[in-house]
């Protein structure tokens, strides 16, 4: 950051870190109360036209985070998840797939995302058909 923003790199990195930890803590606490552990996530930041650090891109989705169910969580073992790990595991087990996912893997991934949605919102996901 120092190369990209001479004189501001350290300040911007500190601000991004503070924002990352604040967003993660608030969301992790919210999710934990609803039965989900947010194991990790990625957040992306940018600068607005006034040079302020702003949160950008997707935030805490199953594509950018690992969501584990609290029920059954055990330290030191692979965890079931409500995220794209399901797809990664299938691809790892099927290296000759040419990255074409079978319908059951796609459907399973959709169900995992819907399960996470329901736990986090308390409502069933309504498919709009879009």
Identify the role of each PLM range.
Residues 1-12, 60-120, 125, 130:
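Anionic ligand-binding catalytic core segments
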Residues 7-39:
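A long amphipathic alpha-helix within ATP-dependent nucleotide-binding catalytic cores
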Residues 38-59:
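Conserved metal-phosphate-binding beta-hairpin within the catalytic cores
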């Amino acid at each position: 950051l120092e190369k990209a923003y001479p004189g501001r790199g350290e300040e911007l990195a500190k601000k991004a870190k503070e924002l990352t930890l604040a967003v993660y803590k608030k969301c992790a606490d919210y999710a934990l109360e609803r039965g989900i552990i947010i194991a990790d996530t990625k957040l992306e930041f940018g600068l607005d036209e006034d040079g302020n650090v702003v949160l950008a891109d997707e935030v805490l989705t199953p594509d950018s985070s690992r969501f584990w169910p609290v029920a059954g969580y055990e330290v030191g073992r692979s965890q079931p998840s409500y995220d794209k790990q399901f797809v990664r595991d299938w691809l790892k087990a099927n290296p000759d797939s040419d990255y074409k996912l079978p319908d059951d893997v796609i459907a399973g991934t959709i169900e995992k995302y819907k399960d996470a949605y329901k736990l986090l919102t308390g409502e069933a996901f309504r498919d709009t058909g879009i």
